[in-house]
């Protein structure tokens, strides 16, 4: 009798995605981040659900409801900090996952890559709205500053901002709708993950060598299930170390002050995982220009496949491109640092240089490096 997992309509889907899936035999730990992201998403939905049971999305009670969760709800503090730091782990895994795609040329799987970009935007929107919910100073002013960017849209900008606010400033209506969106978007993301995997399984995974692995496949289970479980355990270990020993390490102390529209914090800044984009936004002295640069800093990923000039897929055997890739990583770390600094000399100049370098590497230097490497190999 044929195994039920290969026959049952539902079990068959799971079987073909997680058990009998033919996987390349040489994929490294950089291929672990996909499953780690799934773990992060599941953790965030679970902890978020329990937080939503005790949270109230009203300007008068939001801040105290979060305090109530931490003080009075059984294990409320651990749920709250797992959710807050879980977001940080989520973004670490996201950036590693995208970095892997850039390094090994996974962006040649166009549909998977583009769905991934949409997913990235969805999760960034979710995280931004989640940061507003505790209704601390940084929540309120972060929401005010970021939503205000839409006023740079010609002609309809002001109307657009007021429509999103549900009034003439960030207030009760804004908080309520942000909570609604923050609750629903992770489920939208889950659906997109399914589509992401659907497209990935049409072509099969890429591998470090960049060469087709059709002739050398191994079953996903047990080889990669055990590897993914190890990765997940390490992820949870790091998350719990963060939660137990320094839960506020990555947060902003200003968010422990209740939101006050009459007092602006000295430095308004988003969570650390948005600082690189925030630095690019601030480095352009024009409002509309800054907003466009902010959008392009992520949207540039969509044109990466069109800029691929090398005749090799990944960067494994391309030292010039490798150098540029790690220069890009260093540049992004520099931008992250600058985003958290006040707007004054020399940070402004460093931010502008780092922003120019970011776009130059991706749009100009990497395609040129590909051509040079082809030439060196006489291809």
UniProtKB/Swiss-Prot annotation:
> Whom does it interact with, and what assembly results?
The cytochrome bc1 complex contains 11 subunits: 3 respiratory subunits (MT-CYB, CYC1 and UQCRFS1), 2 core proteins (UQCRC1 and UQCRC2) and 6 low-molecular weight proteins (UQCRH/QCR6, UQCRB/QCR7, UQCRQ/QCR8, UQCR10/QCR9, UQCR11/QCR10 and a cleavage product of UQCRFS1). This cytochrome bc1 complex then forms a dimer.
Protein name per its UniProtKB record = Cytochrome b
Task: List ligand-binding residues for heme b b566.
Answer: 97, 196
**Which metal ions or organic cofactors does this protein require, according to UniProt?**
heme b
Cellular component per GO, a single term: mitochondrial inner membrane
Q: What does this protein do?
A: Component of the ubiquinol-cytochrome c reductase complex (complex III or cytochrome b-c1 complex) that is part of the mitochondrial respiratory chain. The b-c1 complex mediates electron transfer from ubiquinol to cytochrome c. Contributes to the generation of a proton gradient across the mitochondrial membrane that is then used for ATP synthesis.
- Cofactor, free-text remark: Binds 2 heme b groups non-covalently.
Q: Give the matching Pfam families.
A: Cytochrom_B_C, Cytochrome_B
Task: Tell me its family.
Answer: Belongs to the cytochrome b family.
* UniProt keyword list: Electron transport, Heme, Iron, Membrane, Metal-binding, Mitochondrion, Mitochondrion inner membrane, Respiratory chain, Transmembrane, Transmembrane helix, Transport, Ubiquinone
- Can you tell which superkingdom this protein's organism belongs to? Eukaryota
Q: Which GO terms describe its biological process?
A: mitochondrial electron transport, ubiquinol to cytochrome c
SUPFAM superfamilies, sorted? a domain/subunit of cytochrome bc1 complex (Ubiquinol-cytochrome c reductase), Transmembrane di-heme cytochromes
Extract the signal peptide range. Answer: none
One MF annotation (Gene Ontology) recorded for this entry: ubiquinol-cytochrome-c reductase activity
